[in-house]
A protein has these predicted regions:
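C-terminal substrate-binding subdomain of Rossmann-fold SDR/epimerase-dehydratase oxidoreductases
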Residues: 214-217, 221-324
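Rossmann-fold cofactor-recognition segment
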Residues: 48-60
Length: 324
């Protein structure tokens, strides 16, 4: 694997972006976090503030994106900047500006600077899939990259369109791009996103607070943010000849919300978590990631118990509480 490449991470001061930056730094790469926010709080907590350059910018501004890529001499782009589920629903015009036009601007920058930019690794999402009932055949079913794509949210629809954009830029203009479809990200410092409320199933009990949650019988793919960061690095740097496709499912550990609550209770014995079966999640979580593992060597580092334990330890330390 090459080292000392400069990687421009859009959305690089956000939750996943900060962890991606940390993972890249630890693997020998120079990193520029490109974001509308220059708040380095998460980068600081991860201990990489001094190792990551921060550049203020807006992916919805085409000239700004091209200038950022050119002036940082980025050889790779990890494109994460997006308005997530709830924000996209509340601001549909902004969602199109950022998620659709912004992604187009990133691909266009890579096309324009084709002698400089080697690859764009970017975030699609499991949200492009339909609700589980569209796939459940009553057996041990898993959704592959070739299965039905029919998003039930505006956010998912923008990601579906992004995949069409990416294919055109790859097939018509030779832009080397790889997308991954992450599921539900969890870990220290998550604050936004459509599934961010699920963080409270860990955070509230860890701090001695009660919590009520719906979707008890719904399956969630719980993907630790450090595993997602690893996946983006592999998407960015796995040699092209080892890739069998351009879009990959990635996941962590599948568990119902009730099972996740039981895992928390096993770590925090006095946890007060009330779980009901009300509600249905808008997209399936049962992703088959055989292709990504075979092509890149990706392996999940955190099962649910280990991931929750790490998460709880960080939370308690930050709040001046004794470890469990």
């Amino acid at each position: 694997m090459a080292t000392n490449d400069t990687v421009l991470v859009t959305g690089g001061t956000g939750f996943i972006g900060s962890y991606v930056a940390k993972d890249l730094v630890e693997n020998g790469h120079d990193v520029v976090a490109y974001d509308r926010s220059t708040d380095d709080r998460i980068l600081s907590k991860l201990g990489v503030t001094e190792d990551v350059a921060i550049r203020r910018g807006d992916v919805s501004e085409a000239t700004d994106v091209v200038n950022a890529v050119a002036e940082t001499d980025a050889s790779h782009i990890v494109h994460l900047a997006a308005l997530l589920t709830n924000t996209a629903e509340s601001n549909p015009r902004a969602a199109l500006d950022v998620n659709v036009q912004g992604t187009s601007n990133v691909f266009e920058a890579a096309r324009t600077l084709d002698e400089q930019v080697e690859r764009v690794a970017w975030a699609s999402s499991a949200a492009i899939y339909a609700p589980p009932g569209n796939y459940d055949d009553g057996g041990d079913w898993w959704v592959t990259e070739d299965d039905l794509v029919y998003p039930d949210t505006l956010y998912g629809a923008t990601k579906g369109y992004n995949e069409h954009q990416a294919r055109v830029y790859n097939e018509e203009y030779g832009v080397d791009q790889v997308a991954i479809r992450p599921t539900v990200a969890y870990g220290p410092y998550r604050e936004t996103g459509g599934s961010a409320f699920l963080a409270n199933i860990v955070e509230k009990p860890a701090l001695g607070e009660s919590f009520s949650v719906e979707y008890g019988d719904q399956e969630i793919d719980w993907q630790h943010v450090e595993d997602i960061a690893q996946a983006f690095r592999l998407a960015a740097f796995t040699p092209e000849e080892e890739l069998s496709q351009r879009v990959y499912n990635v996941r962590g550990e599948l568990a119902t919300v009730q099972e996740a609550a039981e895992t928390v209770r096993g770590i925090v014995p006095d946890a007060e978590i009330d779980v009901s079966d009300k509600g249905e999640l808008p997209w399936t979580q049962r992703l088959d990631m055989t292709a990504f593992q075979a092509d890149t060597g990706y392996e999940v580092q955190y099962d649910l118990e280990a991931g929750f334990e790490m998460y709880i330890d960080v939370l308690r330390e930050e709040n001046g509480l004794e470890p469990l």
